Structures are given as structure tokens and as C-alpha cells.
Amino acid sequence: MQYLVFDIETAPEPDDVLEGLFTFDESAVKNYRLLTTDFDPGEVKLGNMKDPAKIEAKIEAARLKFTMDKAAVTDQIETARMESWQTFQDRAALSPLTGRVLAIGWWNLDTSNTFVAHVDGETEPITENVLIENFLCMADAVLSDGGSLIGHNIIGFDFPFLLRRGLKFGIRPPKTIVNALAQYRPSNLIDTMREWQFGNRAEGFVKLDQLAAFFGTQRKTGDGADFHKKFFGTFEERQEALAYCRNDVVMTAEIAAKMRLIAMPAKQAAAQSESPPEPPKQEEPQREHNAAPTVAQQDDIY
């Protein structure tokens, strides 16, 4: 049986896109009502005051406090807006509505190599839609041939993300994948997170690195939240990001083997555990304009 282990890496949409999707309710900020009202001297509590000078002084003090409080609310709203925007940006990569696919790593256990295909802006870009369509075609072929797809939270995250982003580009979801996702426990989608739950879904999410620590297998080499920052950073940082994706694929395969979900040949496991060679620092060759690369043309992990 053919086994394909995979993992996707996502990023927030560009800021100009996110700005059109971001919403903020400033009325929820404390004392927001001050911005919609004017100072009313009649609301100042004077008690038994009789002295006009003291009355005027108290009213002026109240007016000054109202003005300062109103200015403070404006500052609070701006601070709250910035914090909300930052949270929105930080979580954007987790939703197909606000995020995009940057890279997909996979490993066909019948072979000895892992691969990472990714969008690329150095020359003619491999676009997100090409990346998704090529991978879904490959996944569909594996399932159609009776094989299985393996990943961590692929039922709850990876596949829904890929399929929904694919819809944005007019990519028809493969029936093999849709039908598998519709099953309570699809036999051809091996999700290490679901398998770890043993039916207790109320237990919630378990991180891949937690399972790696538990089983004593390869650990994370970075933080997924930093993937897009490194990917769009220097050449060296991009290589680190792609190596991180590759490592996640190997981690998943090792954990699946530890859970007795698959049998991974020892020599392949050992080969994948070795660090990839340092990539040569050279520019990529110019691609023919508008040429859509196939899966086979996607970049190896270097």
C-alpha cells in the first residue's frame, strides 16, 4: 500500500487584503459613550454649595476631567484597535478566509526523499492555486490507487484549508478526499491527532511536538508561527523555513510509526533523520512565462 505523509505551511494574506477583512467594534471599549456625548454642567453634583465662585470652579474642574477622560478614550480605542489588529494578523494564517498556503511538504514512503513545494517570487512565481491543484491531484491519485494519506490534524485543518482555498481559485475538490472526510473515521486518512484521541475528541488538540517528546522522536526545529516570516526573509531564512516543513513531515511519519499506524522502513527513517545538505547560493533559472509547473517540477527541499 502506498503511504503519503504530508504537512502544509500557511501564512496570513497580505496586509492590504487583511485590512479589507478586519473589523473592530470600538463601542466595546470602556467609556466609549463619552465620545458620543457633550459635557453637561447640569450633571455636576454641587450638593449644598451656594458660593457662585466655588460652583463655577467645581463645574470647570468637572469639564476639564470630562475633556481628559474623552481624550483618554480616544487613545484607548486606538490602543485596542492596534491590539485587535495584531491578534487578527497573528491568527490569520489559521483560517482559509484570511490565510494562504505557502508550502506543502510530503514524503511518499515508497521513496527515500521528502519534498517541499512552495510559492516562489524570485522569478516567475509558482502561484498558490498551482501549488494546491498539483498537490490535490497527487493526493487524489494516491487515494484512487488504494493508498493512504498521513498527517497531523489533516482532517481538522490541512485538508479543509486546502479544499477551501482551492475553491477560491475554482479548483474542484477531489471526490476521493471529500468522501473520505465525510466518514467518521476514514481508513485512508490517517490523522495522528485523531488516532491519539482514541475517540475522546473532548480532550482537544495535541501538538505534534508534544507527541514527539512523548515518543522520543525527532523534535520541532522552530515555530510554525514564524514560518512565513522566515520564508519571506533572507535566502538563508527561507532555507530554514523549508527545512522546518520537511522536518515536520519526518516527525509525523516517525510518530505514526510509533503509534503502529504505519510501518516505516528503518533505513528510510535513518536517511530522513539526517540533516539535508547546505543548499548552494544561486539564483533559480528563469521559467518560461506563464508556464504552470507540475508536481514533479516543484522544488526539492534542497
Residue ranges and their predicted role:
Residues 2, 98-125, 143-266:
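Metal-dependent phosphoesterase core characteristic of DEDDh/y 3'-5' exonuclease domains
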Residues 22, 264-272:
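Short, glycine/acidic-rich hinge or "gate" loops at secondary-structure transitions
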Residues 281-302:
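Long, low-complexity, intrinsically disordered segments
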Residues 125-130, 277-283:
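Short, mixed-charge aromatic SLiMs
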